[in-house]
């Protein structure tokens, strides 16, 4: 049977963690390995994990940031597929993991499975689907138009998974998805919403740093001219 490694990264996330844990606990699919990588929280995050997901594999220690913690999650995973579900985000339905596994089992096992994402607020009120929508046949070059698949709806075969690049502090997930698409031989879409993603804005300073990082990542993967043309296109779309 296919085993799915669900990985949650948290640090003092007591206020947002409950929906995440409950969504994992209610999954009907039995072959789930749940890994929680905690950055030595000082609140009740770990008590919540232990009470709602008692079978979770917990690591709690200081780290060098989000992507360092995600690398720890990859190292600890033993499942066939890796799926990151951050604190505050939740699986859409109790059958969501089962639906992903059924998609994997349709033919040869894909390297990447992906789906759609619903944006929710802190009250779990739906704000709408992401503006960038996943295409039916996802390819690396599609990410020139932005991150078309939310990281939490991007399920990767462990056999191709590489560590996150810690030289990026805000956009390493974008770089990681590009590198996974580069290594993937087959990507398969699940034509449904997989994840409820908790909306949260970056500060202006972090927002601009994130944009600069993303430009550098795009240039590295696609070259300078395609990256410039893509950003001109972004500006045109925003002004329409």
PLM-predicted stretches and their roles:
Residues 2-5, 33, 175:
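Cell-envelope/extracellular polymer assembly enzymes that use nucleotide-activated donors
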Residues 15-18, 43-51:
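Acidic helix N-cap motif at the loop->helix transition within catalytic regions
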Residues 22-31:
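Short, acidic, metal-binding catalytic loop of nucleotide-sugar glycosyltransferases
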Residues 30, 38-47, 86:
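A conserved acidic beta->alpha catalytic loop
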Residues 60-77:
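Glycine-rich, basic loop-to-helix element that forms the pyrophosphate-binding segment
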Residues 82:
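Short aromatic/hydrophobic "clamp" motif used to bind/position activated sugar donors
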Residues 94-127:
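Conserved donor NDP-sugar-binding/catalytic core segment of glycosyltransferases
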Residues 129-213:
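Conserved nucleotide-sugar donor-binding catalytic segment
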